[in-house]
UniProtKB/Swiss-Prot annotation:
Binds to the 23S rRNA. GO terms for biological process: translation. Transmembrane segments: none annotated. GO terms for cellular component: cytosolic large ribosomal subunit. This is Large ribosomal subunit protein uL15. It comes from Stutzerimonas stutzeri (strain A1501) (Pseudomonas stutzeri). Belongs to the universal ribosomal protein uL15 family. PANTHER family: 50S RIBOSOMAL PROTEIN L15 (PTHR12934), LARGE RIBOSOMAL SUBUNIT PROTEIN UL15M (PTHR12934:SF11). Residues 1-57 are annotated as: Disordered.
Length: 144
């Protein structure tokens, strides 16, 4: 037996259905679309979410929530990410330059997560109590 002799077992593959090609096919005449009506016509699709004129579900349910604009210009930074900044002074701009935060961020807060590798000075950056203690324990300081 060669690779070019391989064949599927009889009955393993079904033939493609050809609607509208005679009554013997099982899909003759109406071709499985039923009689009359919108969906029997060519191009007769119903829009997604349309419920036959009844008020659709997405309009019956109330709206809720909103997107806070404050979230767009604020960011949280882990203490372990401070090592990615070159130099001893960490500012918002230096975090942007090191690709730690997004370019549209204006306010940053440091969270305690990971180790503080070296002494750094943070200018204009807030920190949680735990992060502040860890940075100061490593010899770092804060400036406004």
């Amino acid at each position: 037996m060669q690779l070019n002799d391989l064949r599927s077992a009889p009955g393993a593959r079904r033939e493609k259905l050809r609607p509208g090609r005679g009554i013997g096919s099982g899909l003759g005449k109406t071709g499985g679309r039923g009689h009359k009506g919108q969906t029997s016509r060519s191009g007769g699709k119903i829009a997604p979410g349309f419920e036959g004129g009844q008020q659709p579900l997405h309009r019956r349910l109330p709206k809720f929530g909103f997107v806070s604009l404050k979230a767009m210009d604020r960011a949280e930074v882990r203490t372990s990410e401070l090592a990615k900044v070159e130099g001893d002074v960490v500012t918002v701009q230096s975090l942007k330059d090191a690709n730690v935060i997004n370019q549209n961020v204006q306010r940053v807060k440091v969270m305690l997560s990971g180790e503080v590798g070296r002494a750094v000075t943070l200018k204009g950056i807030a920190a949680t109590k735990g992060a502040r203690a860890a940075i100061e324990a490593a010899g770092g300081k804060f400036e406004e």
